[in-house]
Amino acid sequence: MSDILSELHQVLESRKGANPDSSYVASLYAKGLNKILEKVGEEAIETILAARDAEVSGEHQALISETADLWFHSLVMLAKLGEHPDKVLAELQRRFGLSGHDEKAARSGKH
């Protein structure tokens, strides 16, 4: 899985200097971080709605599609801020095997 994330990150990086008229990602970069954050929020809401619909209908394709959109726009956000998706994967790896309660307490400084 990390291979596709790294490949996508390379494409996102290459779009930073591209003409905004030639690429959707370049147009997002040109519009700035607030536009990218707006898209992340929009995709998060669409993912939530798709999950609710999937629970009722049993059909999960829209949920998968919306989750892909959310991940994509989150990767655009990370790239805009100079971060690589490997850092997110490393954080997930660090948390793996930890109790959710213990991990949350560690983040908030509560033990």
UniProtKB/Swiss-Prot annotation:
GO terms for cellular component: cytoplasm. It holds the Pfam family PRA-PH. GO terms for biological process: L-histidine biosynthetic process. Its main location: cytoplasm. Pathway: Amino-acid biosynthesis; L-histidine biosynthesis; L-histidine from 5-phospho-alpha-D-ribose 1-diphosphate: step 2/9. Keywords: Amino-acid biosynthesis, ATP-binding, Cytoplasm, Histidine biosynthesis, Hydrolase, Nucleotide-binding. Its EC number is 3.6.1.31. The keyword Nucleotide-binding applies. It comes from the Bacteria. CDD domains: NTP-PPase_HisIE_like (cd11534). It is found in: Cytoplasm. It is an enzyme of class 3 (hydrolase). SUPFAM superfamilies: all-alpha NTP pyrophosphatases (SSF101386). GO terms for molecular function: ATP binding; phosphoribosyl-ATP diphosphatase activity. It catalyses: 1-(5-phospho-beta-D-ribosyl)-ATP + H2O = 1-(5-phospho-beta-D-ribosyl)-5'-AMP + diphosphate + H(+). The keyword Nuclease does not apply. Belongs to the PRA-PH family. NCBIfam families: histidine_hisI, PRK00400.1-3. This is Phosphoribosyl-ATP pyrophosphatase.
